[in-house]
């Protein structure tokens, strides 16, 4: 076998494996999603935005806090987003303009997380329970939130 054939077959094997792993994780996610929760009030850590799994190894998880008077506050480690929200299960809508502090953040990962969070909060989201103390939010972007126990 020449080098081209070896690389070709390795590439095919890699793609086949990647597709199989993706399919099984999608079916698992679909089976664990249930109806919209009655309430989203409380503090939630953001564990995933779109396909990006967030880690708290170097920077803290972003946090979104929903208050019962329709106020929302979010922070990814530097700047704070705040505004109003309306939740009528399963639809979650944020006020047109969320306020954001404009501090210069020294960490690139925090800055990236803040940008992802602001983008994800810029649309109407459909909220579903996706496990014990977990919420899945889908709109223009996807977010996975886990209840923060204080």
Model-derived features: where do they sit?
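Bacterial N-terminal signal peptides that target proteins for export
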Residues: 1-8
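Short, linear, compositionally biased motifs with a strong N-terminal bias
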Residues: 10-13
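Lipid interaction determinants
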Residues: 19-150
């Amino acid at each position: 076998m020449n080098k081209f054939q070896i690389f070709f077959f390795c590439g095919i094997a890699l793609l086949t494996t990647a597709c199989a792993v993706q399919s099984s994780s999608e079916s698992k996610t679909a089976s664990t999603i249930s109806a919209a929760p009655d309430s989203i009030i409380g503090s939630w850590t953001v564990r995933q935005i779109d396909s990006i799994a967030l880690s708290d190894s170097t920077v803290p998880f972003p946090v979104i806090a929903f208050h019962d008077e329709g106020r929302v506050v979010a922070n990814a480690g530097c700047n704070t987003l705040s505004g109003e929200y309306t939740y009528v299960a399963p639809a979650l809508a944020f006020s047109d303009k969320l306020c954001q502090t404009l501090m210069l953040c020294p960490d690139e990962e925090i800055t990236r997380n803040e940008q992802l969070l602001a983008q994800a909060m810029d649309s109407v989201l459909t909220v579903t329970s996706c496990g014990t103390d977990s919420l899945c939010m889908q709109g223009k972007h996807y977010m996975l939130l886990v209840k923060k126990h204080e």
